[in-house]
Curated annotation (Swiss-Prot):
Spans annotated as Ubiquitin-like (UBL) domain: 20-101
GO-annotated biological processes: chromosome organization; maturation of 5.8S rRNA from tricistronic rRNA transcript (SSU-rRNA, 5.8S rRNA, LSU-rRNA); maturation of LSU-rRNA from tricistronic rRNA transcript (SSU-rRNA, 5.8S rRNA, LSU-rRNA); protein-RNA complex remodeling
Record text on subunit structure and interactions: Component of the NOP7 complex, composed of erb1, nop7 and ytm1. The complex is held together by erb1, which interacts with nop7 via its N-terminal domain and with ytm1 via a high-affinity interaction between the seven-bladed beta-propeller domains of the 2 proteins. The NOP7 complex associates with the 66S pre-ribosome. Interacts (via UBL domain) with mdn1 (via VWFA/MIDAS domain).
Similarity-based family: Belongs to the WD repeat WDR12/YTM1 family.
UniProt-listed InterPro entries: G-protein_beta_WD-40_rep, NLE, WD40/YVTN_repeat-like_dom_sf, WD40_repeat_CS, WD40_repeat_dom_sf, WD40_rpt, WDR12/Ytm1
Top-rank taxon: Eukaryota
PROSITE patterns, per database record: WD_REPEATS_1, WD_REPEATS_2, WD_REPEATS_REGION
This protein's name: Ribosome biogenesis protein ytm1
Protein localization: Nucleus, Nucleolus; Nucleus, Nucleoplasm
Purpose of the protein: Component of the NOP7 complex, which is required for maturation of the 25S and 5.8S ribosomal RNAs and formation of the 60S ribosome.
Amino acid sequence: MEDIQNSASNADLSAAQRQVRVQLTSKQEDIALPDGTGPILVPTGLRRYALSTLVNNLLSNDKPIPFEFLINGTFLRTSIDEYLTANGISAETTLEIEYVRALIPPLHIASFQHDDWVSSTDVLSATSPAATWASAAISPGQERILSGSYDGLLRVWNMSSQVVATSPPAADGGHAASIKAAKFVTPNQIVSAGLDRTVRLWKYSESEDGFSGTIAPHLELYGHKSGINSLAVHAPSHRLLSASSDHSVGFWSTKKSDAPAAPENLLPSAAARSSKRRKLNSSVSVAQRGPVALLSSHTAPVSAAIFDAKDSTVGYSTSWDHSLRTWDLVTATLVDTRTASHSLLSLEHLPELSLLAAGTSARHITLIDPRASATTISAMTLRGHTNAVVSLARDPHSTYGLISGSHDGTCRIWDIRATKADKDGVVGESVYTISRKGLEEQGKADSKRVGGEGVKVFSVCWDKTIGIVSAGEDKRIQINRGEGMLSA
């Protein structure tokens, strides 16, 4: 036993005595070393903490900054010596090491209480898509949060957790069933959809003091024959995508003049005639239109549909039928089908990496390269959740960052450079987990809820200004914020 301990300590000692030449670099200008800083000779026994101390000394920082280190695009999680050995790299080579700011934990900022489960959330801020597309100036303090609830109502909140506006009930032009998806199209327009099979566009306006507002019915879109699970918006082209349980993807125009007539058999008046029920929405008259196209190819409910982040004429959809499908939206034709091993429940595009992230019923996230030249279905798997992954959003600060919302009651932040080798290939690990604040308030923050009983997350949104906004079964919107958590 003593011999084993001696050999281990000798190995550590030899690693500490061995040296390697490293070139330290950073893509972030405010923490970069001066130009001309050459390679430095360091002991191969150094780990992250010692390297962080070294960089802070080189930068002459009065207040130390915690750093993370990347070699060949992967985070260093061992000593340099162990990394060299594991990767078959000679200590004679000059090792390029990139350093980035370490993760700042996302702190809880606020929670907004609702009367029922919250299925969907979106934001309006100076950095949100709805504002940037419209070139609208949203002043600090004037940010808004949109929520869609199982009670069939939309609510717009200010940052002081006050409800500024609520959508009308069904009798006055509102949804006749639970809302499953809601988004700002522009600062003055909202879109929502849900179990009543309709996509609804609303005009949003506020009083001058900003303390009250109205969400007024503007356009009703009919075409789906079953509930709608998610929505995507591309305001510059006035287009929407919807994912429905009727196995189809809806492609819609937000402009009345562009949209085809609504199918007569799907209008509320037809349903009222056939069942002799009182006509709903009788107190208001709202324009009704149909889809530009219904994309039918999936063989099970469609869970998500999104626009390509760089080309709005391309769409992607995921389904319970295990497939990811690529669509040409100009011709409304199917371009490509990728079949995974499990039902796909959520979808997000990482355009700079040419990857699509798909949340699965099998508790993981699959990163898929949709390009025709890709030879494998899954480029990487992100593991950590203990239940279905039903919502995804990309990090506005970093091309490598992603957040997921799961029925296990947590949101997880991922940096796809944080990986490890596994029997299944390259596997990503989450760098931070956000639990529901309500559990902490009840003194149950550490309770394991694999099924997410009472705290399932249904929706997550990540905004550069507001932070991480999540919503779920606990009837709350929760806001967490951590500035620039991952490097670009």
